[in-house]
């Protein structure tokens, strides 16, 4: 009951973010606003998405990159107002939901564990997702119309 209520509230009040669809294994560039004193600048952070957790307002994702031989991980709240935009740089296919094992791998070894997907494969995946989303919306709309008809008949 309460989780259903929370979901409805989140749907109503969460901002609609127009980020590209990305998954674990994708290489993304996150443009994050940083405030230093009275100045504000945008800092890009590029790396592999190693984790996506949660849903709704608490959804976060973790991006890992290696800089001068040192691994850097940064966790971003998905609905943060400080995220300016997210770009998908490279599409990778992995067989795990969490890529924590990349922490032990260095350089090329980590890259070899992620299979690169061709652009046409990615576009086909996006089309299938969009079709499924439209079909779900149609079904929900029909269910609402049926519920309204039943209320009117009652």
From Swiss-Prot:
Alphabetically sorted, this entry's keywords are:
Ribonucleoprotein, Ribosomal protein
NCBIfam families of this UniProt entry?
rplS_bact (TIGR01024)
Record's keyword annotation contains Oxidoreductase? no
This chain is encoded by the gene named: rplS
Q: Where is this region: Disordered?
A: 128-154
Q: What does this protein do?
A: This protein is located at the 30S-50S ribosomal subunit interface and may play a role in the structure and function of the aminoacyl-tRNA binding site.
What family is it from? Belongs to the bacterial ribosomal protein bL19 family.
Any one annotated GO CC term:
cytosolic large ribosomal subunit
Q: Does the keyword Ribonucleoprotein apply?
A: yes
Q: Which organism is it from?
A: Aquifex aeolicus (strain VF5)
**Name of protein:** Large ribosomal subunit protein bL19
What GO terms in the biological process aspect are recorded for it? translation
Can you name one GO molecular function term for this protein? structural constituent of ribosome
Q: Organism classification, top ranks?
A: Bacteria, Pseudomonadati, Aquificota, Aquificia, Aquificales
Compositionally biased residues, Low complexity: 143-154
- Per UniProt, the ranges with Basic and acidic residues bias are 128-142
Q: Which domain of life is it from?
A: Bacteria
